[in-house]
Amino acid sequence: MVDLSVKIGGLTLKNPILPGSGTFSAELARVVDVNRLGALVAKTVSRESRIGNPTPRVAELEAGMINSIGLPTKGIDYFLNTQIPEYSQFTAPLVASITATTLDDFGAMARDVSIPEVSAIEINISCPTRAPDGGNFAMHEDQTSAVVERVCSSTDKPVWVKLSPNAGDIVSIAKAAEAAGGDALTISNTILGLKINTETFRPAIGNKFGGISGPGIKPIIMRMVHQCSQAVDIPIIGCGGICKVEDVVEYMLAGASAVMLGYIVFRNPSALTGIIDELEVWCDKRGIARVADLTGAMIDDPIVETYEAATAPIGQGHVSVHSTAAE
C-alpha cells in the first residue's frame, strides 16, 4: 500500500490533494466525499462583508478561464457563527483563509480564526482582482514580511502564505515570507490578464482585468514552485492548472509537497477524489512506497546525450549520460 501522507507546516495530511481557496464550500460534500481530502481550504474571509467585483466576473479561455470575483464574503462573524459549524461536520483538517487591508486587521483576523476547529491559517496577500491594477501585499518583500510577522505573532496555528505570480521576483518574496515566520507557501494565486470581446470592443470582465487559471498557466507556476523550492526550506503547496494525476506528480517533482486544485473543481468536482485514487495507482505501478518521496525528485541533468537516456522511465534503465563532445 502506498503511503500518501505528507507534512505541511506542522500538519500531517492524509494525502497531498486539497481544494484551492474559493473552490470549496460545505455544499461540495453533496457530490464529493470531502473527508477523503488532505485538508479543506475555506474561501477567503475578511473582517467586513464584501459584495465583490462587478459582473461579468468569469470568461472562458482556450486553456483555462479568467475571473475577477473580487473576494466577496459575508464577513468574519458569518464565517465563525455559520460556516465553522458547517465545516465541523467533516474530518479533514480545516484551513482558514484570511485577508485584510492593514497590519492590525491581519493580526485581529488571525486571532479570530485561531479556534480549535481551524488547523492552519492561509493568509491571502495575493489576490490580483481586488485593486484595479492587480496590486497586493505579495508584490513587495517588505509588505509580505510585515504581514507574515504580524499574523505569526497573533496565532499559534501554522501559517501558510499565498504568493502572487505577478511579483517581479517571487523567489525574493518567498524568502521574505519564510524569514518572517511562515510555515508553508502556497504558489500561487492567478496571473493577471485581459480578455476583450471582439464584438463589443469591451473587456470580457466587468473589472477589466482578471486572474487567469487553468492548464495554460501550469508550466509558469511550476517553474516558480521549482525556483522557490531551491531557495526556501519550508514546504510549498503548488496551485495552478492541475487537472490530472500527472499534473500532481509534475508539481511534486518540481518541489511541491502538496497541491491545490482550482480550475478543474469548477468543471468536475469529483476530480478531487478521483486524483487521490489515481495517485495511489500511479505510485504503486512504479514501486513508489511514499508519495512524499516525489517532492523535489526531478532529475536535473544539465546535458543528456541520447533521447533514449533522457526519456527512460524510472526503474527501467534511466541513466545520466553526459556529452563527450569536448573530450
Language model regions located:
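C-terminal extensions of enzymes
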Residues: M252, V265-G287, A292-E327
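Alpha/beta enzyme core
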Residues: V32-V34, A39, N53, T101-I237, ...
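N-terminal capping/small domains of soluble enzymes
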Residues: M1-L94, A100-T101, I275, T324-E327
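Flexible loop residues that form catalytic
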Residues: G22, V45, S126, T190, ...
